[in-house]
């Protein structure tokens, strides 16, 4: 029977996505076997990320200043916005080194069955960016599942009257798949072969 402190640590690890009881227990015992300095560094890293990381006021990506390094980079093409569901999708797309535009993070996808409606997503600021900036193209890089496709179609409909090019990633990422689990070559091809909607 684990101690109360160990039980609490297992419970906290178990709250992480994709971490079951066995993995949580393994992580907790790993922490127990680490040096005090390693555990302290781990705890400090957790606290630092919570204290220092915030959302970019332009795109919604995570950063440690008011504007993320992508939005503040003048070498990027600010006329092309790639719309993603989550900040982690930006990291995946950036690994391809193919996309040189900027991003917009929705903070989720439409999922009415779970109470996620357009009001819960970061859509209003996207429309404001399109209205005030010189935007030429929106790339909808939502995940190829029912919720992602529904979100892409909803956004395409909303943006139709702006008179800009609206594209989405080409196939190659399997239906029901996730950008997170696709390799960089597949994502690069999907960006290169994007289709207008």
UniProtKB/Swiss-Prot annotation:
Residues 79-174 form the Toprim domain. A zinc finger (C4-type) spans 56-71. InterPro entries: DNA_Rcmb_RecR (IPR000093), Rcmb_RecR (IPR023627), Rcmb_RecR_Znf (IPR015967), TOPRIM_dom (IPR006171), TOPRIM_RecR (IPR034137). One of its GO terms (molecular function) is DNA binding. PROSITE patterns: RECR, TOPRIM. GO terms for biological process: double-strand break repair; recombinational repair. Pfam families: RecR_C (PF21175), RecR_HhH (PF21176), RecR_ZnF (PF02132), Toprim_4 (PF13662). Keywords: DNA damage, DNA recombination, DNA repair, Metal-binding, Zinc, Zinc-finger. May play a role in DNA repair. It seems to be involved in an RecBC-independent recombinational process of DNA repair. It may act with RecF and RecO. Belongs to the RecR family. This is Recombination protein RecR. It comes from Fusobacterium nucleatum subsp. nucleatum (strain ATCC 25586 / DSM 15643 / BCRC 10681 / CIP 101130 / JCM 8532 / KCTC 2640 / LMG 13131 / VPI 4355).
């Amino acid at each position: 029977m684990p101690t109360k402190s160990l039980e609490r640590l297992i419970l906290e690890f178990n709250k992480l996505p994709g971490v079951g009881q066995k993995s949580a227990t393994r992580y907790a015992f790993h922490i127990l076997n680490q040096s005090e300095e390693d555990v302290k560094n781990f705890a400090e890293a957790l606290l630092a990320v919570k204290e220092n990381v915030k959302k970019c006021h332009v795109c919604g990506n995570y950063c440690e200043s008011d504007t993320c390094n992508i939005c503040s980079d003048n070498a990027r093409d600010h006329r092309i916005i790639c719309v993603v569901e989550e900040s982690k999708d930006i990291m995946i797309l950036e690994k391809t080194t193919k996309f040189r535009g900027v991003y917009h993070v929705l903070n989720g996808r439409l999922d009415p069955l779970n109470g996620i409606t357009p009001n819960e997503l970061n859509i209003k600021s996207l429309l404001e960016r399109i209205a005030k900036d010189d935007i030429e193209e929106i790339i909808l890089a939502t995940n190829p599942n029912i919720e992602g496709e529904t979100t892409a179609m909803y956004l395409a409909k909303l943006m139709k009257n702006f008179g800009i090019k609206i594209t989405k990633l080409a196939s190659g990422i399997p239906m029901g798949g996730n950008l997170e689990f696709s390799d960089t070559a597949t994502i690069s091809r999907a960006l290169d072969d994007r289709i207008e909607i």
